[in-house]
Amino acid sequence: MTNQAAEVAKRRTFAIISHPDAGKTTITEKLLLMGKAIAVAGTVKSRKSDRHATSDWMEMEKQRGISITTSVMQFPYREHMINLLDTPGHEDFSEDTYRTLTAVDSALMVLDGGKGVEPRTIALMDVCRLRDTPIVSFINKLDRDIRDPIELLDEIEAVLKIKAAPITWPIGCYRDFKGVYHLTGDYIVVYTPGHGHERTEAKIIQKLDSDEARAHLGDQYDSFVEQLELVQGACHEFNQEEFINGQLTPVFFGTALGNFGVDHVLDAVVDWAPRPLGRVAHERTVEPVEEKFTGFVFKIQANMDPKHRDRIAFMRICSGKYEKGMKMRHVRLNKDLRIGDALTFFSSEREQLEEAFAGDIIGLHNHGTIQIGDTFTEGEALGFTGIPHFAPELFRRVRLKDPLKSKQLRQGLQQLAEEGATQVFFPERSNDIILGAVGVLQFDVVASRLKEEYKVECAYEPITVWSARWISCDDKKKLEEFQTKAMENLAIDGGGHLTYLAPTRVNLALMEERWPDIKFRATREHH
């Protein structure tokens, strides 16, 4: 095995998906603790606690206690290199989250044991299903009251349409929580409260049919054995092939706050989740062990460092090896550049990187030339597929409080649009600026970031736009005719693309009927 193949085999790149408050931030910290990346996990006790979670670093996230921006953390574990991508936990952030999920090879689903499957989880699982992403499941908060575990598994299967195979099974919950039993290994992992902040080796009791196990379970023993027989009779067994194809999820139980069960999940990612896989480009499939470097940008993030007014483009490496100072071709611009200062991430700690391999995420300094979906290679003209823009569902007109700051407003919105935080439209017939979003919170985020980072205060006004469609047509003459007739509702988006802003659903249906040669598209691939 070559050094490059060995490095690729060590990589595991995954994201955590969950509903807000299911414990994603806490489990992120505990995973980093497993990888010795942070010495003490700063707990996220209350939303106002001073020690903010390491991965939630933007001002508004600190205030709201939700991870709005996708950060990337890399840490070593069991001779593997783990790349963990944090996804926005708020229900609004489907675009950003979707694109993050295009950059991973597997995902960890965190469920609140008291609540089960929640709406946000369903939406994220739909996205994972589009690419058959393998899913590992963690049922969290066993140190509180939870629903019947068998009921939770049934719900996963019925609602998320995926087979659930329990690997561990909880012994009690809340004050009676005594640990978990490993179904195939026939051993008990004992839970002792009070070790949430440090790495500790949990006590293991070999064999359920032992005096030690009887003593540990006490009067819960008989009912637990009965429940296990039921579970083993009714549940699916783990099957590696079904897991890799996204048809079955191994399920683990624990408490992230108590730092219990998190290592079982990380072991599953190392043992079962796929190493970096081949990536489909328009031209061909690119294999991770190919010698030549390729990668695509899935996210752009402004102002990660308040000290530097910068933007970072997050790139997933698909093949080859990044070496400091290497030459790359920026395919869309057909331009060669030398990259000497790529970053690797430990949340908002950044380090300059000497080398990186397929599966790794690196950060490139971006001065406005890199866009989401851009491909970088060592010369080959490739374009990776499947990194879309969605048509926004909500629209607002932007009103500037200080008219003298219109230049800063445009510049700020242009940058936020490039980053994917919002979509911006400039109508052909007016000087208005219209923002589009997939969820209401995005408007708040944009207003607060314009104020914090660009010193521009704005307000929003309602506007009669039902949806946006990207316009294209093979017949140039027809397109010109359409542009003349539909001028009132046409706009140019932040990327310079012609867009139709439909005032109502009926209007859009009529236009599509009237102009059969014009393509009205609800998504646009990043090219």
Swiss-Prot record:
GO molecular-function term, one example from the UniProt record: GTP binding
Pfam families: EF-G_D2, GTP_EFTU, RF3_C
Domain of life assignment: Bacteria
Subcellular location: Cytoplasm
Presence of keyword Protein biosynthesis: yes
Keyword GTP-binding belongs to the record: yes
Residue stretches making up the tr-type G domain: 9-277
Keywords: Cytoplasm, GTP-binding, Nucleotide-binding, Protein biosynthesis
Residues where GTP binds: 18-25, 86-90, 140-143
Gene3D superfamilies given in the database record: P-loop containing nucleotide triphosphate hydrolases, Peptide chain release factor 3, domain III
Predominant cellular place of this UniProt entry's protein: cytoplasm
CDD domains: RF3, RF3_II, RF3_III
GO biological-process terms attached to the record: regulation of translational termination
Any one annotated GO CC term: cytosol
Record family assignment: Belongs to the TRAFAC class translation factor GTPase superfamily. Classic translation factor GTPase family. PrfC subfamily.
Protein function: Increases the formation of ribosomal termination complexes and stimulates activities of RF-1 and RF-2. It binds guanine nucleotides and has strong preference for UGA stop codons. It may interact directly with the ribosome. The stimulation of RF-1 and RF-2 is significantly reduced by GTP and GDP, but not by GMP.
Identification of the protein by name: Peptide chain release factor 3
Species the sequence originates in: Pseudomonas putida (strain ATCC 47054 / DSM 6125 / CFBP 8728 / NCIMB 11950 / KT2440)
